[in-house]
Amino acid sequence: RDGIEPWLERMSGVIKHLTRYADIICWQTTDLMKTGSQFIEPTGFHSIRLFADANYRPLWIRVWKMAGGAPGAGPLQLASTKPAPQFDTVLAFAGQEIEAYNDQEYSWVSAFASHAIQFVRRLTRDERRKWGYAGVWEIPAIRRDKDSEPQIPVELPWRCLKMHSDMNGMILDPFAGLGTAIIAAEQSGRVCRAIEADPLRCDLIVRRWEQFSDGKAEKVEA
């Protein structure tokens, strides 16, 4: 279905469950272009409202700039003024104070930070310099061809996991997609529990994980 109402209905339920179990939630959104009208729907702004209803506030907002070649003009762009996707919004949400920064090592932060979430200690100095403090993350998107929808690179969830989780920590992914967050968790030494409604995608996720890890997936009967 087109329009924002189906999206709001689905996401409100997802966010309600996520906020029951996750202290920090990293949320990547793409503006909704297929709305049945000339208007778009900025899902990042709608997400902030849905999380606010669950008493979760944004820790940060970043832009994922899909570095690489120029996007092609698909049927939607040719029939409207709606742009081809070149960026997504990435947000991190949390409830009240979860962690505390090291006041001695990062005393200067206290003059500017309005929250007590510390992710800096999990990153190396080089990671902090290259992307830890950046508001725009330039990471190439994965495209099968110039007209295809961009796929999320492993680097994107990997950065979020590095910032907001520790080794052997539990990661929840309600939209597994092609298993990108699962691969990122495998790379960074985290444990991922993921959900995907599409059986075909589940098969792709299993094959992708096996190719990456050289392991053998086991089916567990419920």
What do the PLM-derived regions correspond to, one by one?
Residues 1-202:
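Core catalytic lobe of class I
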